[in-house]
């Protein structure tokens, strides 16, 4: 029997005090599942603390860990893509660097894969996030249902396992706006959930700010669906029809009673409202056009500054590589 290989991909940001514990838990857990070989890919998303120095130490200590450092902060999803592109496991497991996603329950995700699912997401009965982060998750869930057709009963989190063919399909996306959930849903709908316990954060606070969450929502809103453009078209047709009908009504009313005032205030309110709607629609269309331009302009999905592995050997120290586009 050929031993399956598991690749763990962990995006790291401000995790100098937590990543060692996560790695140790993975090692302890995998020691109890001897039927799998495994390796780890730790991606430093240009963290301002000593995260990459800790990763470098771990790479020197263990020969199945590879450390990747990005040239600037590209975001969690781009960091995941960097790790996925380096991984070569039959099954890839993605999890967080803060210890909130329980590595000791990875067996549940692997069992789901072995039972036939292409992707298995961890689901939490209760989350130990701030109210702000939980609101962001709720909004993201609504958006993925509307834009990407996600089933209502499916829970999507940052802790999941995927088969190799799903990862390979995700990696065919080379533009600079990666959205992991959209890439997964585009590859397969054979997705299941397994219940796991969501832990409290070991130290620190979430790296997601309002700006980052808004960017993530807008990315998912526009990257994998033209539904917003269709909504814009329907809205425009609706307002045009309403304006035409109101115009006929005004003319008829004037003929019936010539002394009725036309209503300057109502007219201005309608003009301002419709003008605002037009600006929103133009902005949305402009966002799509801007993304097309940036993608054509070969903006990188991420840039690798340094990579360490193979028991501490440096593989690309100081190199700047555009991994998002390959000629």
Regions found by a protein language model. Give the residues of each.
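Acceptor/aglycone-binding surface of glycosyltransferases and processive sugar-polymer synthases
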Residues: 68-72, 76-86, 100-178, 199-218
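Structured catalytic core of nucleotide-sugar glycosyltransferases
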Residues: 1-130, 143
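Histidine kinase transmitter module recognition
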Residues: 11, 29-32, 43, 98, ...
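Hydrophobic helical membrane-anchoring modules
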Residues: 2-3, 179-327
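Solvent-exposed polar/charged
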Residues: 60, 85, 111, 115, ...
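Residue-level recognition of specific faces of alpha-helices
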Residues: 39, 54, 64-67, 76, ...
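Short conserved micro-motifs on helix faces and helix-strand junctions that flank
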Residues: 11, 70-72, 160, 233, ...
